[in-house]
């Protein structure tokens, strides 16, 4: 299992817009073949910080995800909302 944890920080006045933009990516991603989980998490201590927990069966499923229209649109629309670049950490899932 291929797991990615993405951290995204957005401007104070862009929180609701971020949620709207990411909702479309979430809805498309959970329908993809090979997707096991796609959670959008908001930090209760820092409401402008979000984490995306993505689990796919393998790297090929992740590669496919990055070709989808919902992913490409989301990435494009995120740029002006973020305070800096996204950070990603990749994990190998052992015990889901």
UniProtKB/Swiss-Prot annotation:
A Gene Ontology molecular function term of the record: oxidoreductase activity
Family annotation (PROSITE patterns): ABM
Compartment list: Cytoplasm
Major place of residence: cytoplasm
Coiled coil: none
EC number(s) recorded for this UniProt protein: 5.3.1.32
GO cellular component, one term: cytosol
Record-annotated membrane-spanning stretches: none
Keywords: Cytoplasm, Isomerase
ABM domain segment(s): 2-91
InterPro entries in UniProt: ABM_dom (IPR007138), AI-2_Isomerase_LsrG (IPR050744), Dimeric_a/b-barrel (IPR011008), LsrG (IPR033672)
Swiss-Prot/TrEMBL catalytic activity: (2S)-2-hydroxy-3,4-dioxopentyl phosphate = 3-hydroxy-2,4-dioxopentyl phosphate
Assembly and oligomerization: Homodimer.
Function: Involved in the degradation of phospho-AI-2, thereby terminating induction of the lsr operon and closing the AI-2 signaling cycle. Catalyzes the conversion of (4S)-4-hydroxy-5-phosphonooxypentane-2,3-dione (P-DPD) to 3-hydroxy-5-phosphonooxypentane-2,4-dione (P-HPD).
PANTHER family referenced in this protein's UniProt entry, alphabetically: (4S)-4-HYDROXY-5-PHOSPHONOOXYPENTANE-2,3-DIONE ISOMERASE (PTHR33336:SF1), QUINOL MONOOXYGENASE YGIN-RELATED (PTHR33336)
Family per similarity comment: Belongs to the LsrG family.
Protein name, as recorded: (4S)-4-hydroxy-5-phosphonooxypentane-2,3-dione isomerase
Source species: Salmonella paratyphi B (strain ATCC BAA-1250 / SPB7)
Origin organism lineage: Bacteria, Pseudomonadati, Pseudomonadota, Gammaproteobacteria, Enterobacterales
